[in-house]
Amino acid sequence: KIIGIDLGTTNSXVA
C-alpha cells in the first residue's frame, strides 16, 4: 500500500 499519499509521498512504500 502507498501510505506516503497521506504523509506526502516521501514515505510511500513504507507499507
From Swiss-Prot:
<comment type="similarity">
    <text>Belongs to the heat shock protein 70 family.</text>
</comment>
<protein>
    <recommendedName>
        <fullName>Chaperone protein DnaK</fullName>
    </recommendedName>
</protein>
<keyword id="KW-0346">Stress response</keyword>
<dbReference type="InterPro" id="IPR018181">
    <property type="entry name" value="Heat_shock_70_CS"/>
</dbReference>
<comment type="function">
    <text>Acts as a chaperone.</text>
</comment>
<keyword id="KW-0143">Chaperone</keyword>
<keyword id="KW-0547">Nucleotide-binding</keyword>
<keyword id="KW-0067">ATP-binding</keyword>
<dbReference type="GO" id="GO:0005524">
    <property type="term" value="F:ATP binding"/>
</dbReference>
